[in-house]
Structures are given as C-alpha cells and as structure tokens.
Curated annotation (Swiss-Prot):
This is Small ribosomal subunit protein uS19. The lineage of its organism: Bacteria, Thermotogati, Thermotogota, Thermotogae, Thermotogales. Belongs to the universal ribosomal protein uS19 family. Protein S19 forms a complex with S13 that binds strongly to the 16S ribosomal RNA. It comes from Thermosipho africanus (strain TCF52B). One of its GO terms (biological process) is ribosomal small subunit assembly. Keywords: Ribonucleoprotein, Ribosomal protein, RNA-binding, rRNA-binding. NCBIfam families: rpsS_bact. The gene is rpsS.
C-alpha cells in the first residue's frame, strides 16, 4: 500500500532545505544524501544529488522524467556480475 495522498510525498527536510538554498542562490553543487527514500520533487530538477548505496555516493543528475520516483531507484545497491557462460556448461558430461 502506498503513502496517503493527503500527507504528500516524503522528502527529507534537510535535503529539501539544501535544495531551496541552492535554488535561491542559483548554484549547482553536488549534494550528498543518505536519504534513499526521499521522493524527487520538481524543485530538484537540474541538480546533482549524490545518493549513498551502502558503499559510496553515486551522483545522480535529476531530470524531469525522474519526478515522482525515489532517489534510491537510481543508485543500485547490488552489483550484477553477469550470467554464467553457456560455453562453460556445454563441456560438462551428465551422468
């Protein structure tokens, strides 16, 4: 079940405060955040936010298409090593 519409989207208050300060000053700095659950709002468009993935901060440039999604969706926490080669399994003999 999703969040109630009367509450509005969750955005970390400190992150939103930093975004608003940068918008007033007209600056474009990278903002570090650990708040992966924060919703991307239109005020964030054009900023680069470094989202923590458990190991390091991944820079994410916010575009209009991302509005309504969560910051954590763009900073993967797991590394995909790839599927096994089919050629490696062909040489095995079934018993």
């Amino acid at each position: 079940m999703g969040r109630s519409t009367k509450k509005g989207p969750y955005v970390d208050p400190k992150l939103l405060k930093k975004i608003r300060q940068l918008n007033e000053a007209g600056e474009k700095k990278i903002i570090k955040t650990w708040s992966r659950a924060s919703m991307i709002v239109p005020e964030m468009v054009g900023h680069t936010i470094a989202v923590y993935n458990g190991l390091k901060h991944i820079p994410v440039y916010i575009t209009e298409n991302m509005v309504g999604h969560r910051l954590g969706e763009f900073s993967f926490t797991r590394r995909f090593g790839g599927h096994a080669d089919k050629s490696a399994s062909k040489g095995q003999v079934k018993k």
